[in-house]
Amino acid sequence: MSKMRIGVLTGGGDCPGLNPAIRGIVMRALDYGDEVIGLKYGWAGLLKADTMPLSLEMVEDILEIGGTILGSSRTNPFKKEEDVQKCVENFKKLNLDALIAIGGEDTLGVASKFSKLGLPMIGVPKTIDKDLEETDYTLGFDTAVEVVVDAIKRLRDTARSHARVIVVEIMGRHAGWLALYGGLAGGADYILIPEVEPNLEDLYNHIRKLYARGRNHAVVAIAEGVQLPGFTYQKGQEGMVDAFGHIRLGGVGNVLAEEIQKNLGIETRAVILSHLQRGGSPSIRDRIMGLLLGKKAVDLVHEGKSGLFVAVKGNELVPVDITLIEGKTKNVDPAFYESVKTFFNK
């Protein structure tokens, strides 16, 4: 069993579960006698050869810590050819045998491109949006849902106290998994997701029915990527675009709150959960899945695999070609959304 020098990085938005994955990688690598090197702040770490050692002592107590001890960024080395070449050079200078990238579609997509250039790469999926194809689960989703549920519970208390409608804006650029699951588990009175064009008149009638039967408040959950019909508002600040071309979203909750108040005459406030959904100690599931995904990634490295990520399929962890998720989004089935509308308050 040959010893290896394995690099690890975390890219894109942070989320709970990254540190457990790092711990899982290091713990499994120790079984092989490997040396693990952390690349700081995502692909920027490879570009700048900015590293840190990942020893047992460094990771033994990080299971319950949110975020990532390696730091993260949205650096895209493929924006410039010279950056690509610098990364390839640094990979060799650091004497890496393989690199494990923990991230979403963008981070894993970069890993896939480097794999095609001959650098051994394995991916671990993470995103609180749970919108990656080919996998049933992504790190961070479970904890983020818990945060959304807790927020809805707290906001319902204040909505009830002041006889208001509160609109909760939840992350989800193209997919509404977080808003739908968080809204259902939190008992939101109505939920809007990007996959289904919103019917505002249906929403207004729903709130009218609640008030007609004596209820004095409502909580509406909406994913940040929802496009309200008839509005041409900018769903993100002008010029606020990341290295992968994504506009930073935010604001649909405020627009919806204004429309509810204007059309129903009920005081309405908007709350944007934003980065609260990314922080905090990982849930039990995110801790266990992080450990298992990290372990499997190291095993794939020792099997000589590259260009793959560890997918969750039922109760199994299986290697999947990263190219199968590039440019794709795992969306909520509109039929499923319609079926669970029965749980919206009546």
UniProtKB/Swiss-Prot annotation:
Residues the UniProt record annotates as site (Important for catalytic activity and substrate specificity): D106
EC id: 2.7.1.90
Annotated residues for binding of diphosphate: G13
Biochemical pathway: Carbohydrate degradation; glycolysis; D-glyceraldehyde 3-phosphate and glycerone phosphate from D-glucose: step 3/4
Name of protein: Pyrophosphate--fructose 6-phosphate 1-phosphotransferase
Residues reported in the UniProt entry to bind substrate: T127, I128, D129, R164, M171, G172, R173, E224, R269, H275, L276, Q277, R278
Single GO BP term: fructose 6-phosphate metabolic process
Cofactors: Mg(2+)
